[in-house]
Structure formats: structure tokens, C-alpha cells
Design a protein with these regions (language model features):
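Membrane-embedded alpha-helical hairpins and interfacial helices in multi-pass inner-membrane proteins
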Residues: 29-34, 42, 62-85, 89-90, ...
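Hydrophobic transmembrane alpha-helices
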Residues: 2-55, 59
């Protein structure tokens, strides 16, 4: 029985990683840079349903950031592979641990972590790549613009996905 559970978690995480990477790369013109909105970030709600989403989201982010680096579609380069993916992974862990805190039935707090962590981390990495140091006014712009895109993806897309998964009972399969 334990092998069946392990296979299920590997499969779930792999499907989530693939979905994240594909959604990011299909829409790469709006997925990278100071003004960005990764629609794949709507998937950051999935740790509410399964811990497999933690590593799935992180791996999907690594894959999409790696492909963006080797194709020259990101200014953040290797830093985004390391720190952007780390921010996604930490946010996924936080989402998982706050999954039971609900406001009017919605995991609002769980969606705050991907927004704030990515705004701060990606905002800082973009600023350092652009300026060579942490210029606070540029950081504020980058963090706010990344955060705005994240907020759209997480609060609009993520919460819609949450309701769809919950309504269709797909969450019981995760």
C-alpha cells in the first residue's frame, strides 16, 4: 500500500510540475521581467489539496526558469532558477501549512505567501540584475509590479481554481 501512495504522490507532483512549466512557457512574454503575470501561479493553490504540489510547483518553476535562461527569455538568469524557484517552494510550504485557515470558505491566507514571497524575492533579484545593487526605489517598483501580477494570478486565478477543484470534488482525488 505504501508503494501505491508513493507512486500517487510522484505522479501528482509530476503532473503539477509539467502543468506549471507549460503554462509559464506558453505565455513567456508575460511570465518574465519586471512587469509579469505568470498565470501558472494560479496553481500555487494546489498545496491546499496535496503536499505533492509543494515539490511539483518548485520543480515546475525550476524547469520554466531553466528553459527561460537557456533560450534568453529572462534578464534574471541563473538567479531566477535559484532564488525564484526557492521562493516558489517556500511559498508552497507556507500554503500547505495554512491550508485549513479559511475566510468565508476560501484559503485567502494561503494565497498571500506566493504573492509576498515572489514580490520580495523576484523584485530583489530583478533589481540587483538591473542595477548591480539593491536600489530601493527600483526594488519598490519591481516588487510592486511582480506582486501585482502575482496577486492577479493567485487571488483571481488561484481562488477560481480552488472553487473549481472543490466543486468538482477533484480535491478528494488529490
Amino acid at each position: 500500500m505504501k508503494n501505491g501512495i508513493a507512486i500517487r504522490h510522484i505522479t501528482q507532483g509530476g503532473v503539477i510540475a509539467a502543468a506549471y512549466a507549460v503554462l509559464t512557457l506558453i505565455l513567456y512574454p508575460i511570465a518574465f521581467g519586471p512587469v509579469q503575470c505568470r498565470l501558472s501561479e494560479a496553481l500555487t493553490v494546489l498545496p491546499v489539496f496535496t503536499p505533492s504540489a509543494i515539490w511539483g510547483l518548485t520543480l515546475g518553476c525550476v524547469i520554466s526558469n531553466f528553459v527561460a535562461v537557456i533560450t534568453g527569455n529572462t534578464i534574471a538568469g541563473v538567479w531566477d532558477i535559484l532564488f525564484g524557484s526557492l521562493a516558489t517552494g517556500v511559498a508552497a510550504v507556507c500554503t500547505y501549512f495554512t491550508r485549513k485557515i479559511r475566510f468565508k470558505g476560501l484559503p485567502i491566507l494561503s494565497m498571500v505567501f506566493p504573492v509576498v514571497l515572489n514580490a520580495l524575492v523576484v523584485g530583489a533579484e530583478l533589481t540587483i540584475v538591473e542595477k548591480g545593487f539593491l536600489d530601493w526605489s527600483l526594488f519598490a517598483f519591481n516588487a510592486l509590479s511582480v506582486g501585482a501580477g502575482q496577486a492577479v494570478a493567485c487571488f483571481a486565478g488561484g481562488l477560481l481554481l480552488f472553487k473549481a477543484v472543490e466543486k468538482t470534488k477533484l480535491g478528494t482525488l488529490l
